[in-house]
Amino acid sequence: MIKAVKMNTSFDKEKVRKHLPGAIFLSLVVITSLWLVISTISWMTDEDRLPLSHMIIQGQLKHITADDIREAIDSMDSIGTFMTQDVNKLQDALLSLPWIAQVSVRKQWPETIKVFVVEHQPEATWNNRVIVNPEGVVFNAPMSDLREPKPALFGPETSSKDVLDFWHQLQKQFEPIHVTVHSVALTERLSWQVVLDNGIRLELGRDSREERVERFIALYKQLESKKDSIDYIDLRYDTGAAVGWKSDDVENKEEN
């Protein structure tokens, strides 16, 4: 047989009265804390608070100016506050400048951004359109920005590093004969053509490139006294070379 049990639902008024002040105090603390958090977040994200109004620029600037950097950042749709601005977006905006190779942006409390810039170093021009850095990487800066003459390199779009490496090699090999390389071209058929600073054009062809360069060096030592009259030297032979002279007289063409 199941007996019914009557639940005691009466409140202990004394106990409630005893704990009520503590509960009210705790509630006030929680509410106040939430209000402070919300107010702080609102204050820190307010565009009128902590605006990024100062900039420190570091790095050696030769081809761009501090004004170029400021204009790139000002061109963004909007610039946030110290708390809201994503530095990656600032970096992306600066990397759109053609002379910037690397950039690092940091925020400094309370209203400053620090920008460290590394410029591309121009080593040569490429296909009379753009510029190559010392690693053979092409970057799309205007050639008119160059402050001194650079060697002219030509070739298929993906060959910039190979052509630059060959130019470096020739510069070293030609030091003993006191000539420098004005331009190096690799044709679509992978044939090499070199123009020296004295205007002499070398036809090296596709094969036996290293041997033909050595052959030219030996030949040039013999012809150095006549260098001002030489138009081109064609080394696309198993042995020897054909020398083309600037004179129109075909009798001045020599076979060596």
Curated annotation (Swiss-Prot):
Q: Any idea where this protein resides?
A: Cell inner membrane
Periplasmic side, ranges: 45-256
Chief site of localization: membrane
Show which residues sit on the Cytoplasmic side of the membrane.
1-23
Q: Which InterPro entries match?
A: Cell_div_FtsQ/DivIB_C, FtsQ, FtsQ_C_sf, POTRA, POTRA_FtsQ_type
**Can the keyword Lipid metabolism be found in this entry's annotation?**
no
First and last residue of the signal peptide: none
Q: Which domain of life is it from?
A: Bacteria
What is one Gene Ontology biological process annotated in the Swiss-Prot or TrEMBL record? Answer: FtsZ-dependent cytokinesis
Entry annotated with the keyword Cell cycle: yes
**Could you describe the subunit structure of this protein?**
Part of a complex composed of FtsB, FtsL and FtsQ.
Q: Which family does it belong to?
A: Belongs to the FtsQ/DivIB family. FtsQ subfamily.
The protein's role, per its UniProt record: Essential cell division protein. May link together the upstream cell division proteins, which are predominantly cytoplasmic, with the downstream cell division proteins, which are predominantly periplasmic. May control correct divisome assembly.
Concerning PANTHER family, the annotation shows: CELL DIVISION PROTEIN FTSQ
Which named protein is this?
Cell division protein FtsQ
Q: Which organism is it from?
A: Aliivibrio fischeri (strain ATCC 700601 / ES114) (Vibrio fischeri)
